[in-house]
Design a protein with these regions (language model features):
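Metal-cofactor-dependent catalytic cores
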Residues: 2-182
């Protein structure tokens, strides 16, 4: 029996004593199965709103204020302390727009990762290097995408904007760090 078959059988057996339906439990457990580990490909910060992002190799991450040196540092809600986008989504957007490549600076996100579906981290905590983050929402595109990416940039980014996160445990994030569900 495959590992997934064993998991599903255990869930089915455990449900004999629970009020949850089999399908609800299976879905809940499937949402926790994220064996992929991603990798940090790019990091950018900006000290002022609408300023161009500065590319860095590493950044200190603080629990109360987010990324050191980023303009969202100390924002009131803390829900957008860190923004992340998938390299695979940048590739999709560049294809939609007929471009060879999109410079991550133009998307105004802090961290570009590859190898993991960021949307699968919704409602979960995850680790990048020694930093623990928690997803707080979907990062929707703003009107600057039209200016930064050209005609159709806003619509090309819809569904590909990444996620927002808050800091649970501080530390440092650097290029090449692993990103994984915890």
């Amino acid at each position: 029996m495959s590992w997934l078959g064993k998991v599903l059988q255990k869930i089915k057996d455990d449900n004999k004593f629970m009020n949850m339906s089999y399908n609800e439990t299976v879905l809940k457990d499937l949402l926790r199965i994220i064996p992929q580990k991603g990798k940090v490909e790019w990091i950018g910060i900006r000290s002022k709103k609408k300023e161009e992002l500065s590319v860095v190799e590493s950044v200190k991450v603080e629990k109360e204020t987010g990324l050191e040196g980023d303009h969202f540092k100390g924002s009131s809600s803390g829900k957008r302390q860190v923004t992340l986008i998938q390299q695979e989504h940048l590739n999709a957007v560049s294809s939609i727009l007929g471009k060879k490549r999109i410079d991550p600076k133009l998307t105004r996100r802090n961290i570009v990762v590859s190898g993991i579906n960021l949307l699968s981290l919704k409602h979960h905590q995850f680790r990048i290097g020694d930093v623990t983050l928690e997803t707080t929402g979907i990062c929707t595109p703003c009107s600057l995408m039209e200016e930064n990416l050209g005609a159709g940039g806003y619509n090309a980014m819809r569904g590909h904007g990444g996620i927002t996160a808050t800091v649970i445990e501080e530390g440092k994030i650097k290029l090449g760090d692993t990103i994984e569900l915890i």
